[in-house]
Design a protein with these regions (language model features):
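Sequence-level detector for tyrosine residue identity
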Residues: 30-33, 52, 95
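Periplasmic/extracellular, small/polar-rich flexible segments of pilin-like filament-forming proteins
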Residues: 55-145
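Weak global preference for isoleucine
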Residues: 10, 18-21, 53, 57, ...
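Membrane-proximal N-terminal amphipathic helix
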Residues: 35-65
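Amphipathic alpha-helical segments typified by the pilin-like N-terminal helix
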Residues: 1-47
Length: 145
């Protein structure tokens, strides 16, 4: 009698199939996790930008002479506040880390915080997901007095 040791071909195929199924489930779960993490990072950056710009403008209205941690004088215009915010906020875009998240533009790219001005108002808009549908946009307006 032979004493066979080892696995049969069927046993090996079953193990490979099980590993394949587990890998497929893991990849799908991981992709969902990263998508929600990028959206949450975009929302957080939007909130931080609004708070930062508001706080700096408020400091200026209380008599502070310097603006956004630089030697710039406090802004008399919303445009100068936008320029200061874009130059000092260097967070990376979670959807494209080769670009900064905060930009002075009206274009809407996923993960980008667009800071613009009109008259005495600074507007902060953020697209939180790819596609930028109306439910994926955050907007805040800050008045510069």
């Amino acid at each position: 009698m032979k004493n066979n040791k080892g696995f049969t071909l069927i046993e090996l195929l079953v193990v490979v199939a099980i590993i394949g199924i587990l890998a497929a489930v893991g990849v799908v779960a991981y992709n969902g996790y990263t998508a929600s993490a990028k959206a949450n990072a975009s929302k957080t950056m939007h909130s931080q930008a609004v708070k930062y710009i508001s706080a700096e403008i408020q400091k200026c209205s209380l008599g502070e002479s310097k603006f956004m941690g630089t030697n710039q004088d406090c802004p008399a215009t919303a445009a100068k506040a936008v320029s200061g915010a874009v130059n000092t906020m260097t967070d990376k875009n979670p959807y494209d880390t080769s670009n900064n998240a905060v930009k002075s533009s009206s274009s809407f790219v996923a993960g980008q915080v667009s800071v613009s001005s009109s008259g005495s108002t600074v507007t902060v808009k953020t697209c939180t997901k790819s596609g930028c549908g109306s439910s994926d946009q955050l907007t805040a307006s800050i008045s510069v007095d």
